[in-house]
Amino acid sequence: IDHSNPDLSAMTFLTMEPLEGVACLRRSVQVTPDTRRGTVEGTASYQLQNTTGQEQTVALGVTPGYTISNVRANGVEVPFSVSDYQEYNEAKLEVAIPAEEQVELTLEYGGFPQESMPTMQGSKELSGEYLCLENAALSPRLMNVMPGEDGYPATIEITLPAAMTVIPFCASEAEVVAEHGDGTKTWRYETNRAGGILYAGDYVREEIQAGGLTIDFYYGRKHQAVMEAAGAAEA
């Protein structure tokens, strides 16, 4: 059940004041969806620079369907809290980071992704045929930490059934970096943003030539016979 503020003009999270003297230099995510149960488990790491000489409270947007655990700064457990207030299917996770200049913030998360409008086109789904993880559903999203000089460079890894292909909604392509004995593969891609969108599915890929360009055209394998009969790749 979605408990987000019904006022769609609310922007409490979007208008948070950024912390002065705190920046994110890099982040990484390792996420493993369970396509049979419809759940997600993941770990996230944020390389933060704190030049204030004081403890700071970092805010992240989290999916309310997830449980947050094992929150650490430079390997030491730190206090955290998750707000009851929700906005656009996000709750606010607040974490106290130490006064040290270089801080590696790590955390674990897991549970059921939720969404505010399940009937909208392109809505989130998590199955062996298709999944879409957006922003906080993919990993907790920094809300009050500004990017470093290089932006928000991020490495995303996701482990899925071998039949699924990963398509990130960004400029880079995902590549397989490991194949496991349990019939899964780990994909990796680089991006540069605080959030992100990831699609994956049991896809068939066709190359289409158009205007001197080669375009990758993907469609679900269950539609392969229909698409081939219709000559979709030649259309």
Where are these regions (language model features)?
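Hydrophobic core residues within well-ordered beta-strands of beta-rich domains
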Residues: 40-44, 103
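Short coil-to-beta strand junction motifs in C2/discoidin
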Residues: 61-66, 150-152
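Juxtacatalytic substrate-recognition/specificity segment
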Residues: 207-235
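Extended, low-hydrophobicity, Ser/Thr/Pro/Gly-biased non-transmembrane segments
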Residues: 1-15, 45, 108-200
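A surface-exposed beta-strand-loop module
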Residues: 57, 64-125, 179-186
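Ligand-binding face of N-terminal immunoglobulin V-set domains in extracellular IgSF glycoproteins
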Residues: 43-64
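Short structured motifs
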Residues: 25-33, 89-94, 138-143, 170-173
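N-terminal, polar/Ser/Thr-rich
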Residues: 1-41
